């Protein structure tokens, strides 16, 4: 969000006395991060001047000879602009003036006449604003009427003395896009009174046009009639505020509405009253239709989208974009202005589908309260005064009432909090407080429970001011954090094998939280007041999340990779569990001959598992008696420890499970509960004295059946005298079998082996493998 200090001070003059550094610190405490601070470079030696004479230059048709008067002195100027008349007030850059665009004003002869100054265009005194101006404003000089404040300088009138803050506001505080609400927060912080009144005393003139609401996706809806819209000319003092907020000026009527939205955060939309046939109806589309938008693009409206219609046509895609058929144009004199509040999820989904990024769509995609909408409607009526009539206003009344637990804030924070200070601050924010309950501020939807109230209190009582307390936590008493070291060892090993580590949400919907519950945890924790039903329970597995990662990347047309996650699982019925989940969707081993010959299968998955558990010094055995429904019966095994307890599963995912995620690759999974191994001290591995002699390395390839125990083969080859190490270096498919290449290392450690001794060892290996 862009924050203009000039506008903030105009809304709340009391904030003028707050130094900039204190204001920025307050914004940070309130959750609004100040990313940049920019001061507009003002021009020097500018004055307002009244036009006395204007004649055509005798030697140049495109120039005018102008006499202007400023501070009782007359200046003769040569000017190329034509958008002004005698008696208008203009901006004069006197001699020796230096403009913000770098131009220095000196006497200059133009076709025989000397110009003793320059009449300025807005882009010349604020060159950064070029992209926010209309072509008319770019081509002409600044012209004011007699009503401007004669006691202010041009830099003050055009807000060129402004300081602009670029803020990052909390994602759940859409209201803070409006100056009224950010001013209210700041005033509460500095203990100033600030009230935004939403009382509307206008009676509805329902006889003007009939309005009907036929959708539950409308939270509130107001519409007013405004006549003589051509008379509402936005003064440069206000127009320059829009520009400082990086809002493009369009026309006087649109600029008026954009300024109101800037104040309240609630977008507005207007229809030309002449172009409305019959009644106005807000409803969900009953069938697909085409809308020609204000941007002259066609959009496909789908059944269920929220639309606004009259008796003949679609007037707007609610909260997103208006129709070209009902737009305000240069000939419009009467408008119906809509001030509404819609279902943000529906607006966000529709805008995303249609790839529409209008300012209205972005604002309406996040919640605002009906109070904000009502304040906006009140300001609309006040802005257009006697030309405005309220036609219709509807709202759902919602007051969020929560239990008063302010007296428990000290226990929650872990430090003594002054309750009087806390209550005063909350009341300034708009809370209504009694002994038993709190009514949350009318303009806020983000306060759902007492913890949100505590968060508000801590905005005033900065966490930085609380004295630090020593932390008492058992894990800090460990000489070494064995659990961390263990998990790091697992992660490093898998990354070395080419797998990618993932970190996914712990929160899922109720169904997803209980899927792939291989370890029979009884119940998942449910979250109180979740932000969404999709984030309502703590997950009991990682596999659902990892499969969603694959699904997302496949939809984005990214190459799928082998992935894993180590996460903390918190079941209701037991202590915290550490679960490792691995998903293999592509080959682990790359062939040196031909990539197409390599497959991802159960054998390679078992080999990875064996290598991992060997690295971790974990003894295990396979068990066929424990099965899970998500894996093929003939392609899954449980892992049991020395106490015959199941601590993991390995297997191939069934096709029907894969299809729910839109996946077609063969997918093999490893799911291990590593909780009991986290804090075990690692076994010290004894090593023999390094050999003084080089290894003799030999390779042998052999065709093996898919059900052969490779670990057993490797162990038996290692039993042959003088073979110190055996590994699988390659494998590939040939005909109906798999050919494995075993690499073995021969070394006597004490002396060089003769050729005859090496041949004998080779024969022993060959003879052993012949049985397969």
From Swiss-Prot:
InterPro entries: aa-tRNA-synth_II/BPL/LPL (IPR045864), B3/B4_tRNA-bd (IPR005146), DNA-bd_dom_put_sf (IPR009061), Fdx_antiC-bd (IPR005121), NA-bd_OB-fold (IPR012340), Phe-tRNA-ligase_IIc_bsu (IPR045060), Phe-tRNA-ligase_IIc_bsu_bact (IPR004532), Phe-tRNA_synthase-like_B3/B4 (IPR020825). Keywords: Aminoacyl-tRNA synthetase, ATP-binding, Cytoplasm, Ligase, Magnesium, Metal-binding, Nucleotide-binding, Protein biosynthesis, RNA-binding, tRNA-binding. Its cofactor is Mg(2+). PROSITE patterns: B5, FDX_ACB, TRBD. It is found in: Cytoplasm. Residues 40-158 form the tRNA-binding domain. Binds 2 magnesium ions per tetramer. Its main location: cytoplasm. Pfam families: B3_4, B5, tRNA_bind, tRNA_synthFbeta. One of its GO terms (molecular function) is phenylalanine-tRNA ligase activity. Its EC number is 6.1.1.20. Residues 691-772 form the FDX-ACB domain. The keyword Membrane does not apply. One of its GO terms (biological process) is phenylalanyl-tRNA aminoacylation. The keyword Nucleotide-binding applies. GO terms for cellular component: phenylalanine-tRNA ligase complex. Residues 397-468 form the B5 domain. CDD domains: tRNA_bind_bactPheRS (cd02796). It catalyses: tRNA(Phe) + L-phenylalanine + ATP = L-phenylalanyl-tRNA(Phe) + AMP + diphosphate + H(+). Mg(2+) binds at residues 446, 452, 455-456. SMART domains: B3_4, B5. Belongs to the phenylalanyl-tRNA synthetase beta subunit family. Type 1 subfamily. PANTHER family: PHENYLALANINE--TRNA LIGASE BETA SUBUNIT (PTHR10947:SF0), PHENYLALANYL-TRNA SYNTHETASE BETA CHAIN AND LEUCINE-RICH REPEAT-CONTAINING PROTEIN 47 (PTHR10947). Tetramer of two alpha and two beta subunits. This is Phenylalanine--tRNA ligase beta subunit. The lineage of its organism: Bacteria, Bacillati, Mycoplasmatota, Mycoplasmoidales, Mycoplasmoidaceae.
